[in-house]
UniProtKB/Swiss-Prot annotation:
GO cellular component assignments: cytoplasm; cytoskeleton; extracellular region; filopodium; lamellipodium; plasma membrane
Family: Belongs to the SCF family.
GO MF, one example: growth factor activity
Positions annotated as glycosylated: N100, N106, N149, N178, N200, N206
Protein name: Kit ligand
Natural source organism: Coturnix japonica (Japanese quail)
Keywords: Cell adhesion, Cell membrane, Cell projection, Cytoplasm, Cytoskeleton, Disulfide bond, Glycoprotein, Growth factor, Membrane, Secreted, Signal, Transmembrane, Transmembrane helix
Assembly: Homodimer, non-covalently linked.
Post-translational events: A soluble form is produced by proteolytic processing of isoform 1 in the extracellular domain.
Length: 287
């Protein structure tokens, strides 16, 4: 019986060890912002000044908290960066393409990791309900990556409290101001770098839809990983429980034959005593 209890306790401890990585992935995601953001200046210098990048954005409003603005902007940056990355596939001049591709790929990874830290599934209803706040525009690289840097700054500001703050819009939401785009188009200084021959043609609808699927697919990758860990843990617990029950059933019935043998031995002693008494009585009668 003690061995069966020890086996069940061991399986329970293994279950806790398997669930530990799941708790860690849900409670902490580390720092998704790496030093690769320092290469943005080089990338902006490599892209033509008149190149336009499409982005759906939400203008800053007093009634929209910064951490909620972050939830609205990050998925759109992920889509735009995926589209930008795909456009380098069709470029024949490979002089600066590899460098630019590497930088954009690193920035895409950062924004995707950041999106995983934001618990996108938790606030997707908030994003759907406030889709009317989006405006679509085409930005030159300088202004596009200024917005990108602003998004990174907001994340750093609220990184420790994002899990605690839910996005709830007030009953009355102000409309985006007309001069909001003016704030976006302020110039910033980047070091001049030779511009590459990146073409400004748009990708076909199939390529665009594929990149959107990739962006959306990453959103659910973290949740799928958590589900797989949870299922593995539950399966191990079930197997451990079944093995414990089988072991207990095999060891427990062994105690019954022992008790039967003991009972039989007691019966034999009583019979022997009775037979001895009977013999003594016979001898006494004979005498």
């Amino acid at each position: 019986m003690k061995k069966a209890q020890t086996w069940i306790i061991t399986c329970f401890c293994l279950q806790l060890l398997l669930l530990n990585p799941l708790v860690k992935t849900q409670s902490s995601c580390g720092n998704p912002v790496t030093d690769d953001v320092n290469d943005i200046a080089k990338l902006v210098g490599n892209l033509p000044n008149d190149y336009l990048i499409t982005l759906k954005y939400v203008p800053k409003m007093d009634s929209l908290p910064n951490h909620c603005w972050l939830h609205l902007m990050v998925p759109e940056f992920s889509r735009s960066l995926h589209n930008l990355l795909q456009k380098f596939v069709d470029i024949s001049d490979m002089s600066d393409v590899l460098s630019n591709y590497s930088i954009i790929n690193n920035l895409t990874r950062i924004i995707n990791d950041l999106m995983a830290c934001l618990a996108f599934d938790k606030n997707k209803d908030f994003i759907k309900e406030n889709g009317h706040l989006y405006e679509e525009d085409r930005f030159i690289p300088e202004n596009f990556f200024r917005l990108f840097n602003r998004t990174i700054e907001v994340y750093k500001e609220f990184a420790d409290s994002l899990d605690k703050n839910d996005c709830i819009m007030p009953s009355t939401v102000e409309t985006p101001e007309n001069d909001s785009r003016v704030a976006v188009t302020k110039t910033i200084s980047f070091p001049p770098v030779a511009a590459s021959s990146l073409r400004n043609d748009s990708i076909g609808s199939n390529t665009s839809s594929n990149s959107n699927k990739e962006a959306l697919g990453f959103i659910s990758s973290s949740s799928l990983q958590g589900i797989s860990i949870a299922l593995t843990s539950l399966l191990s617990l079930l197997i451990g429980f079944i093995l414990g029950v089988i072991y207990w059933k095999k060891t427990h019935p062994k105690s019954r034959p022992e008790s039967n043998e003991t009972t039989q031995c007691h019966g034999c002693q009583e019979e022997n005593e009775i037979s001895m008494l009977q013999q003594k009585e016979k001898e006494h009668l004979q005498v």
